[in-house]
Curated annotation (Swiss-Prot):
The gene is rpmG. It comes from the Bacteria. One of its GO terms (biological process) is translation. InterPro entries: Ribosomal_bL33, Ribosomal_bL33_sf, Ribosomal_zn-bd. Keywords: Ribonucleoprotein, Ribosomal protein. Belongs to the bacterial ribosomal protein bL33 family. PANTHER family: 50S RIBOSOMAL PROTEIN L33, CHLOROPLASTIC, LARGE RIBOSOMAL SUBUNIT PROTEIN BL33A. Disulfide bonds: none annotated. This is Large ribosomal subunit protein bL33. GO terms for cellular component: cytoplasm; ribonucleoprotein complex; ribosome. The lineage of its organism: Bacteria, Thermotogati, Thermotogota, Thermotogae, Thermotogales. SUPFAM superfamilies: Zn-binding ribosomal proteins.
Length: 49
């Protein structure tokens, strides 16, 4: 079963992206994505929606 999660910028705390992940995976997602508020690529970590 897949659950919906948000991706939050580690630098500014802005939630920029939403995605899904497999519920059985316990590790938090950590992806390098573009943040329009910071105007650069930063790491984004998983948060609850």
């Amino acid at each position: 079963m897949r659950v919906q999660v948000g991706l939050k910028c580690e630098e500014c705390g802005n939630r920029n992206y939403y995605t899904t992940k497999e519920k059985s995976k316990k590790d938090k997602l950590r992806l390098k994505k573009y943040c329009p508020k910071c105007n650069k690529h930063t790491f984004h970590t998983e948060t609850k929606v």
